[in-house]
Amino acid sequence: MATVNQLVRKPRTPKVEKTNVPALNACPQKRGVCTRVYTTTPKKPNSALRKVARVRLTNGFEVTSYIGGEGHNLQEHSVILIRGGRVKDLPGVRYHTVRGALDCAGVTSRRQGRSKYGAKRPKS
């Protein structure tokens, strides 16, 4: 236990919490430009071709962002919005692309969970 005099000389420092999404700078989303759109394979035991994009953000960071949903219209120089949220089986992918915002189109013919994929309500 520190004495009062020790605490006067050197106060207690609060613990600094490390963020999982440093490129967002405590913002909910960030805008960026795709520098490369490609597919990559997940860690064992999963097998697939996951769609990802390398994105240069407005704050200068260059990050890898996952493109969720079936099919996308992204290519190099597309302007997209990214949010936090890692992909567990893709090492180094800590961000998700927001579907239906800026240049990224929503998922077509999506019926359930539409808000997560930027899909409009279908005409019944």
Curated annotation (Swiss-Prot):
Lineage top rank: taxon: Bacteria
Keywords assigned by UniProt, alphabetized: Methylation, Ribonucleoprotein, Ribosomal protein, RNA-binding, rRNA-binding, tRNA-binding
GO molecular function: rRNA binding; structural constituent of ribosome; tRNA binding
InterPro entries membership: NA-bd_OB-fold (IPR012340), Ribosomal_uS12 (IPR006032), Ribosomal_uS12_bac (IPR005679)
3-methylthioaspartic acid: residues carrying this PTM: D89
One Gene Ontology term, aspect cellular component: small ribosomal subunit
PROSITE patterns: RIBOSOMAL_S12 (PS00055)
Keyword Transmembrane belongs to the record: no
Keyword set includes RNA-binding: yes
HAMAP family attached to this UniProt entry: Ribosomal_uS12_B (MF_00403_B)
Subunit text: Part of the 30S ribosomal subunit. Contacts proteins S8 and S17. May interact with IF1 in the 30S initiation complex.
Family: Belongs to the universal ribosomal protein uS12 family.
PANTHER family given in the database record: 30S RIBOSOMAL PROTEIN S12 FAMILY MEMBER (PTHR11652)
Function: With S4 and S5 plays an important role in translational accuracy. Interacts with and stabilizes bases of the 16S rRNA that are involved in tRNA selection in the A site and with the mRNA backbone. Located at the interface of the 30S and 50S subunits, it traverses the body of the 30S subunit contacting proteins on the other side and probably holding the rRNA structure together. The combined cluster of proteins S8, S12 and S17 appears to hold together the shoulder and platform of the 30S subunit.
Full protein name: Small ribosomal subunit protein uS12
Organism: Shewanella frigidimarina (strain NCIMB 400)
Lineage: Bacteria, Pseudomonadati, Pseudomonadota, Gammaproteobacteria, Alteromonadales
